[in-house]
Amino acid sequence: LDNSGADLWVVQKDTLGPYAESSSVNDDVYRTILNMPGVARAANVTYLTMQVRKGGSDVRALIVGIAPGELGDTPGWPPYLVAGRQITRSHYEAVADIASKFKLGDRLTIRRNQYTVVGLTRRMVSSSGDPMVFIPLKDAQEAQFLKDNDAIWQSRRRTEANQAFNRPGVPGLMDAVMASQSTNAFVNAVLVTLKPGHGPDEVAESIRRWKRLTVYTRAQMEGILIGKLIATSAKQIGMFLAILAIVSAAIVAFII
């Protein structure tokens, strides 16, 4: 939460996203949020946990799609690097946490595309401990929302067979429908930073009212992470320690 640089998280209505639940909002929502009172910056972001391949091995990682911008000016960017540089191109570059064991210059395969590691960061992991890999937002949208070639072909066949879209008297309708099916117009959340003098609760309520979306402050998001995600892991660890203590006591009793 701290490394994201956000004061507010705008997510799909009635969800606990983007960390505890899946969330999907249109990628043009951030423009109207930027014009709301008290908002200093707003940036789209995506999160996707998956296996990232490098050569013959793979690493489970949280893929973070970050919006174009500058460090310190765009929420969601890794706040600092230990080696290399930040992402400067719109495609096929990545910044990885050192816990992933990736090195500068490594070639990673994410879905159908390959990425070059240009920077390394530290202490950027998910709530489950998976290292983060940052890539450009457009690439991340494609990785999460775009179907594979076979699925796209099957979808187009179904669309062509649907008489509602394939009308003889409307020649451009089919092309428009096909184009809309191939776009990636969704993100998981919008990260918002506030102007000085504006309270998070006040701005969050304004966004909820006018945009009909769910908005979480930093305190609320911390509560979700601790209560919904970390608490479950803590209970599992506690149960394991209790079993270990019982087994150890039994072994000591048998020895005595």
Residue spans of the language-model regions?
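Peri-transmembrane interface segments
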Residues: 1, 183, 191, 196-250
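Hydrophobic, regular-secondary-structure patches
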Residues: 1-62, 83-90, 104, 179-182, ...
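A short acidic, helix-capping loop that chelates divalent metal ions and anchors anionic groups
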Residues: 16-20, 125-128, 224-226
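A short, local hydrophobic-aromatic micro-motif
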Residues: 40-43, 118, 188
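Hydrophobic secondary-structure segments that place a key small or acidic residue at a functional site
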Residues: 45-48, 57-67, 76-172
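Short helix-loop capping/hinge motifs at secondary-structure junctions, enriched
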Residues: 70-73, 199
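A short beta-strand structural signal in non-transmembrane regions
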Residues: 150-207
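Interfacial "coupling" helices/loops that link adjacent transmembrane helices in transporter permeases
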Residues: 252-256
